[in-house]
Design a protein with these regions (language model features):
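Active-site metal-binding loops of divalent metal-dependent hydrolases
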Residues: 23, 53, 149, 178, ...
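Glycine-rich phosphate/adenosyl-contacting loop at the front of the ribokinase-like
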Residues: 3-92, 342-346
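Conserved beta-alpha-beta core of the PfkB/ribokinase-like small-molecule kinase fold
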Residues: 152-226, 243-244
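A short, aliphatic-rich alpha-helical micro-motif
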Residues: 137-139, 198-199, 230
Length: 346
């Protein structure tokens, strides 16, 4: 069994974050990069960074001082070793990473368009995916982040579902980022049961406008919430790029949050770090599962969406998939002050 040593040993009440998802090496290209010389193909990458939907958010949380761990799989190669080292360098427990000696670690090619939105091509060589891991220690109000195709993949569904049930039984807060790509649209019917189960496990569901158009052919937050989400989960976040964020919550909460204009270098990690900022806010504000069930006060929702938006904006300013060091250090200091004040008031 993997145990987690708190990064702040003097603060005994800090919630842990456990992410479960894919690991991948993102090789990033800029479609509009000017060619230099007659023989320049215009295809030279502008960067290569470890990534994965939940992975990116967990890295940001590790950088901000959150006690974080990650469950995933890699191949036994240079890419896999780089990914594990990257987790450890960013203070994320990597003890639950499966290394398969017969497999190659996955990579993706990400092509940024003129708006710096990414189009992906994925390459994966895991012929026998099985996700064999020992469940980490989970206590009440720890936070589990899951999502993307990894959370509905039939090949590893039994293991993922078993972990989600274990986390739920132990009182964890489950945060589900739907993140369902159009490339899997032909599998929607086959995966529908897994998607609905995930909605039922979740205490918080976040998805983008594109996710729900692909999954349910529905085009606005209110319709998605009432028709597809609210029966399973009352706390719902609907993002739509530069358009306002829509939030629905237990107790009838409903609010729209404008997205501040920003110049972007890459939007690859925008949604992933929105998730990270929201989870950071849950810990900073001491949100419990019981509070989510009964309904959060409007000012708490405001604070959570504010943190989520700040994390997302920061990561859009570079080609990296997680928040930068200066931002992370600032958030780490804020968290330490906040948790210390709470400890003194106990």
């Amino acid at each position: 069994m993997a145990f987690f040593v708190p990064l702040h040993p003097n603060i005994k009440t800090m919630q842990k974050v456990i992410g479960i998802g894919e690991t991948i090496l993102d090789i990033i290209f800029k479609d509009e990069r000017p060619r230099v010389g007659e023989y320049d193909s215009g295809l030279q990458p502008i960067g290569a960074v470890p990534g994965g939907s939940v992975f990116n958010g967990v890295i940001s949380l590790g950088r901000t001082g959150i006690n974080a761990a990650f469950i995933s799989e890699t191949g036994n190669d240079r890419v896999g070793r780089k990914i594990i080292q990257f987790l450890e360098d960013n203070h994320v427990d990597a003890n639950s990473i499966n290394v398969y000696p017969e497999s190659k670690s996955p990579i993706s090619l990400a092509f940024l368009n003129e708006k710096n939105d990414a189009e992906y091509i994925f390459y994966k060589d895991h012929p026998h995916d099985r996700l064999d891991f020992v469940f980490p220690e989970i206590q009440a109000d720890d936070i589990v982040m899951f999502g993307s195709y990894y959370a509905v993949n039939p090949v590893i569904r039994q293991q993922v579902q078993g972990f989600l049930e274990y986390a739920q039984e132990h009182g964890a807060i489950l945060y589900y980022d739907v993140n369902f790509r159009a490339s899997h649209q032909n599998e929607v019917v086959k995966l529908n049961a897994n998607i609905l189960e995930n909605l039922e496990y979740a205490d918080i569901v976040r998805g983008s406008k594109e996710d729900f158009e692909v999954l349910f052919n529905k085009h606005d937050a209110e319709t998605v919430y009432k028709a597809q989400v609210s029966f399973y989960c009352k706390n719902f976040i609907y993002t739509q790029g530069s358009e306002p964020i829509e939030v629905r919550g237990a107790g009838g909460f409903s609010r729209q949050y404008p997205v501040a204009p920003m110049s972007t270098v890459s939007t690859i990690g925008a949604g992933d770090n929105f998730n990270a900022g929201f989870v950071y806010g849950l810990i900073k504000k001491g949100i419990t599962r019981e509070m989510l069930v009964t309904g959060l006060a409007p000012e708490l929702w405001d604070a959570l969406v504010g943190e989520a938006s700040a994390f997302s904006a920061n990561v859009c300013g570079s080609i990296h998939n997680s928040v930068d060091e200066a931002f992370a250090n600032q958030k780490k200091r804020e968290l330490e002050v906040c948790l210390k004040e709470k400890e003194e008031n106990i």
